[in-house]
Each structure stands twice: as C-alpha cells, then as structure tokens.
Amino acid sequence: MIALSQEAVRSKDTINHYVLSWREGEQPSPEQVEEAVSIFMDELGVKDHQAIYGLHADTDNLHLHLAINRVHPETLKVVKINNGFDIEAAHKAIARIENAQGWQREQNGRYQVLENGELGREHIDKDKPRQPAQPKRDMENRTGEKSAERIAIEDGAPIIKKAQTWEQLHRELAAKGMRYEKTGSGATLFVGDVGVKASSADRDASLSKLQKRLGAYQPPQRQQVAQREPEPIKPDVPGWKDYITGRKAHYSEKNADKLVQDKRQEQERKQLAEQQKARRDELMRGNWKGKGEVLNAMRSVIAAEQAAEKAALKEKHQKQREQHRQQFRPYPDLEQWQRMQKSPELAEQWRHRASEPQRIEGDRSEPPTPRDIRAYQPEIVGQQVHYSRKEEGGRGGGVSFVDKGKSID
C-alpha cells in the first residue's frame, strides 16, 4: 500500500483513515465486518482500491480502523472521494450499513434508507431545542455539569428574545448571573466568567439582530451580576454535588500551583539572564587592546558555559512541570468517580441514563451467593454480589454487572 501511495508524486497523503464504531453491546460477526467494509468502500466509490482494516475491542465499543488508499491500483490516479466531501459520503455509508445489518441508528445520523432503498436526508426539526456544540456535550457527559453554552441557550436566550430595551436585557441577565458584552464586531454572552458566542445561544441573540430590534448597543450601567452555582445536567444524581465540589477544588489547586510555579520559573530565568549579562559586561571592561584572539577565546568559553547553564535550568524546569503533572493528574469523570466510591450501580445508571440498561429479572429474590462465572471475580457487597472481569494476575477490574437477587443489572 505504501509503495503504491508513493507512486502519486503530486499528492503528499493518499491514505485516508476512518473509524467505524458499534454501540456498546453490539457484536458484529466477522462476516458482518467484511460486509460493512464492502458497503463503506462502495458508497465512497473506492471498492477497487487497496484497504487495510482491523477490529479493536480495547474499549467498551467495538470499533473498526479502516485505511483506504486513494490511488487506483491500475490507473495510478488519485481519487478525490465525493469531490472532497468524504465525510458526507461516510454518513451515507453508515446509514446503509445500519439498514443492511439491523444496527440501531445513530442518534444524530444525517441519512436513513427509505422504503424504496434510496437514501433520504434526515428531517431537521426546526422546533427541536438548540444543543451545545459537541465538545461541550462531551464535557457534560464526563462531568454531569451543564456547560456555559447550555445555560446560555436555556436561560439566556429566552431573556434576550423577550427584552424590549438594552436596560431590561442587562438587568434580567445579571439576575441570572450573566452579562451581554460587545466584543469586536460581535457580542459575547458571559455565564459567570465563561464567554459564549452570543449567536450560539440563539440566532436572534447576535449583536446585529439585537441592534436592529433595540437600537445601538448600550453597555450595562454598574450592574450587580448574581453568583451562579454549578448545575447538574440531570437533576437528582446521587453524589454529584460532592463530585463537582471535589473536581473544582482539584483544578483550582492545580491552577494556583501552576501560577506559582510559572512565576518562580520566570524569576529564575530572569535572574540567570541578569547574572550572565553581568559576567559578560565584566569581561568587556578589561583592557583587551591587542588581545583580540584571547578575547574571542574567552567569549567562546563564556558562551559555552552560559549555554550549559541555560540548558540545566531548562531541564530543571521541565522536571518541575512533570512533577506538577504527576501531582495533579486529570480528575476522574463522574462514572469513574462513582465506581471509585464503590457505587457501581450509580455508575451504571449514569452511563445508561439516556437508555434503559440491559437487565435480567427473576420471579423471586435470593440471598447474595457468589457464583463461579468464568472470567469474572465475585464480591459480596451488602445484599448484592458485584462481578468484575478478571485481569492479569487474577485481580478484578471494574464492576461489569450486579446480582441483586431478583434482578441482574
């Protein structure tokens, strides 16, 4: 594949990499994997091209890495997949794979296969509530905390849309811990100290549209902005307040320590620079008339010594920064934290909050009795038995399922 790729001397990178991921619990057979690759490559128009793929099971979701060589093996021409819009073609391929193999559709899939076998664009519901950008939703999933963008959408946008004057807009936003400020040619809606692009909250919240409706922008007049507390994305999550308090304390301490370290290191760099300059100045104050060769030799010696001093200081600072990173490791996400608190059931509830988790229901309850289940390590916890997948050395990993007597979650 590499040799063929190098034949395309005018194209630097002719190998595209894609990742196809199945939902947790979905187990494609080898035949289905082969079929999925064929459908995917056919939809992208590269069915005759070279490809390498492999199925990985190192995460909770089985996923397939697929590398496709865009150089045609016979014509040696470089194919521009879907005129450069290969991701759009990939969305179509996913819809066809889901339809052919019966997998659950992606929540935000762009396409679906119609009854006549043709692809149809998923209907966009204009009345559907606006959602934060994907990175913000990812952070919400990790921490359980509403992002500033979501708060701007849910709390800020309604206030902005109903405001009749700039004074009313600033006053009502301030009561909710927000402020609307002109920034450059646009505007930013601040939720606490976190800025959100105003148009991300609502199309009608942009500066241009508000100025058409309310007149020229008027800044707030000494407005007292209320203090906002962190808000959970889902109400009544057990332990969430303790989790988010610990998380914020962790990063507050980390940032404070980093500021002290940066200030100290900057002072050390400045001090070394001053010392080295003083030494060079002292050298030049001597009488070097007629001793040019000696002066140049001394300059070389001092330059080498000072370069070594700078390198030593740089290495020292790098070690300090690494110690800082080790001391303040990333705080666990909410699910990990719940498992660390010996609450696997709560962790599973959070993990599957958007769907009904798989479970087995019986017709009677039994006392907690460890069962010999291959590859799993049982542990009695109260009136339950927690089963963890065995790792190397016989140790148990994270809890996989819980036997509650009458039901298994």
Swiss-Prot record:
Biased composition (Basic and acidic residues): 118-149, 262-284, 309-325, 348-374
Domain of life: Bacteria
UniProt xrefs under InterPro entries: Endonuclease_MobA/VirD2 (IPR005094), TraI/MobA_relaxases (IPR049751), TraI_M (IPR054462)
TM ranges: none
Stretches the record annotates as Disordered: 117-149, 215-239, 262-285, 309-409
UniProt entry tagged with the keyword Nucleotidyltransferase: no
Keywords, in A-Z order: Plasmid
The name this protein goes by in its record: Protein MobA
Organism ancestry: Bacteria, Pseudomonadati, Pseudomonadota, Acidithiobacillia, Acidithiobacillales
